[in-house]
UniProtKB/Swiss-Prot annotation:
Taxon lineage: Bacteria, Bacillati, Bacillota, Bacilli, Bacillales
Family: Belongs to the UPF0435 family.
UniProt organism field: Staphylococcus aureus (strain NCTC 8325 / PS 47)
Pfam families: DUF1128
Name the record gives this protein: UPF0435 protein SAOUHSC_02093
Highest taxon of source: Bacteria
Matching HAMAP family: UPF0435
Length: 68
């Protein structure tokens, strides 16, 4: 069974280890572009560690996908 956008965001949020987890509210990604979110999810999951600049870039990309 495929993951929902919300499940992907939860997994990304956990991997990024973001202190303020409210910044990545899974509910705000229900209608996000599934292909773009999957690309981000796949990248994050493929990495053992993420550099601070990668975390920033991922957070920025997620911010562009979020629906308020």
């Amino acid at each position: 069974m495929a993951m929902t956008n919300e499940e992907k965001v939860l997994a990304i949020r956990e991997k990024l280890n973001i202190v303020n987890q409210g910044l990545l509210d899974p509910e705000k990604y229900k209608n996000a572009n599934e292909e773009e979110l999957t690309d981000i999810y796949d990248f994050v999951q493929s990495r053992e560690r993420l550099s601070p600049s990668e975390v920033t870039a991922i957070a920025d990309a997620l911010g562009q996908l979020r629906h308020e």
